[in-house]
Amino acid sequence: MSIKLEDLHSFNEAVLFKGEEDEAPAPVLLLDKYRVRLVPITELPLVSNYSNTSQLGLNSEEVLVIDSPIESAEKQKTSSLLNRRENKKTIKSEKEDESMDMETAEGDKENTVSETGGGPLVTSFLTLDKLEKDGVNDVEIVGLDCEIQFFDANPIPFEDGISLQRFLRLESSKNFSAAVDKLPIWISTIGHHFPSVCWLAAGRTNKNVQVSGATRILGYFNENSQKLVKQLNEACGAAQVNRYRAVYDVIRKIATPTREAPGEVIIDMRWNTKSSLVLLEQPDNAADCTIKIDLGWGDNRFFIDETIFEQLFFVLNLADVLANPEKEVVFRSESDKFDDLVQEMKQLVEACSHEDNVFASNEKSEQVTDKVWNIVRKCSDVKQATMLFKNFLQALTYGKIKSHVQEGNKSHLASLIRASKTCDFRMPILERLSTIEMMMEIGVESLRGRIINKFSDTLQFPSDELTFILKTCENDLSTLEGTLHSSVVSLLPITMAMATIHQIFGFLNVKDLVVLPDLARRVLTKYTTGMVEKAKRGETETDYVFETTLPLLRMNKEAFMHKRPRIWTCENTNTVGANVQTRAMTTLELEPSLEHVCRLVNASRPVRPIDEDNRKPTEEERNADYTVSHTIFSYLPKL
């Protein structure tokens, strides 16, 4: 029975919706012996390192990945060990609360570069025996939480892969439907000596030219792997131009119990040279640097002012409760003592009772409603907030509050303050939802001013333009049904834009900061329009991703090039006339995403001893951290 495209899509859906406790869905089998899956080519390890996979010219963006349905003994052992360790971590996390100090230290450990290169790389050379011993004794190794997400592959022996490839060349139409038979095929293989072929590829281009390919693992970076690269490139023919790429991880996407949706910052550099290939070649000043910023959701590593972000998410929670009253307000885990808050409110009323002590004489001053917000937001429940509001409103009733509020302050509390000065004041009835709404309104007013001032002062962006953008976004959202309070939601894109621009600010040379205002406008436009468009479809915008490309000349190299590139590649193409004959790519990776490749290379990689005197590793030792691979695609001309 031939394999149909619907079978492959059904399997992918079953995997996507599989629960943690559910059994793995039954694989789609070829000849009752090989697993077949449909995978986007951009997700294939090593091959996805191409600067542009569409340049390969394949007739489909999805390929068939064929491997064994049975995991190797080594993979089963590793999976069992990591599951055991994960269970221990879960039990431990339930017993202990993670403090902010630990979270800060963890962030530094992830992103601060040490003399050994920073990050979790030092742990990638642990043997399985040592890892198993560590798991049994429950000893934590620094950096072990930075686990690599391996691509699911169960390779078959290289000899079997060659036989299968030959069989499919002749018999694929008998085993695949017409739609599946057209797709390119990638066979996962393994050898025990270098160079070891990990991918065998075959297919056709969109011009119906036959393509065959292979990815070889050459070992760790040393003289031998350099010689192999040279020999393989010479076999491909002379290339006129070398196209280089280096990918730097500035902030890594690492989830923690307090950071469930982490963000990341990546700098992807590309440049061309006509000189001979040099592994780990440094970029020239003409290199293009693509800055990719993904803020994640609630990732405090991007917070310029943590109190602003903390209060923003709190106000969003208040708006959510107003829209869904069955939900509860989530107050701070460490709230102040209520007696202290009562005393703070008493002191505020006293300060506001003097006519010569009037807050908010200009837009950047703190209003009395801001003062009230900074007290009530520290409560532990809605009842406490209600009592504090009543104390303040009682003072309004007796005309004790002499302070004024700005004309643009549209909160209900601001209108009550104005009414108290015209003898038109009536004490409102404070119930659960009315208290929450009053809190939300003064929180919005406080945050709006702070965000605009912070954005303007830190990044030198016109405050009146920010005010206009914010108001436009709020008006657009207010016309849509089913959205949360537009005054609250409109603060999100502005705040996220501030975090994004602050990241770019750190990468620019001082003399090139003139480009920042235009970049800020692009970010603001992208985030605000994205939020409005999603709101029109009834969706909530939680994806804040921005990319921009700048020449290396504008970049502050010290801000990111003190790190080592996680991925380094060199691509070259050999042509005969107008036709491409071969495409070759040399790749150096610090963290290959194929587990069997890591295991094979690590078995031969020299283990760098940890010296008590903190000796700096040599360049040769640091280079040995890289795994070297070489991919060749051959295009067979039509006869």
UniProtKB/Swiss-Prot annotation:
Cellular component per GO, a single term: cell cortex
Subcellular location as annotated: Cytoplasm, Cell cortex; Chromosome, Centromere, Kinetochore; Cytoplasm, Cytoskeleton, Spindle
Function recorded in the entry: Essential component of the mitotic checkpoint, which prevents cells from prematurely exiting mitosis. Required for chromosome segregation, the assembly of the dynein-dynactin and mdf-1-mdf-2 complexes onto kinetochores and spindle pole separation. Its function related to the spindle assembly machinery and kinetochore-microtubule attachments likely depends on its association in the mitotic RZZ complex. The RZZ complex recruits the spindly-like protein spdl-1 to kinetochores.
Acidic residues biased stretches: 96-105
Broad class of where this protein is predominantly found: cytoplasm
InterPro entries: Zwilch
Sequence ranges of Basic and acidic residues compositional bias: 76-95
Example of a GO biological process term: protein localization to kinetochore
Gene this chain is encoded by: zwl-1
Family to which the UniProt record says this protein belongs: Belongs to the ZWILCH family.
Region (Disordered): 76-116
SUBUNIT field: Component of the RZZ complex composed of rod-1, czw-1 and zwl-1. Interacts with the spindly-like protein spdl-1. Interacts with NDC80 complex component ndc-80.
Annotated organism of origin: Caenorhabditis briggsae
Keywords: Cell cycle, Cell division, Centromere, Chromosome, Cytoplasm, Cytoskeleton, Developmental protein, Kinetochore, Meiosis, Mitosis
Membrane-crossing segments per the record: none
Keyword Iron: no
Designated name of the protein: Protein zwilch homolog
One Pfam assignment: Zwilch
Signal sequence range: none
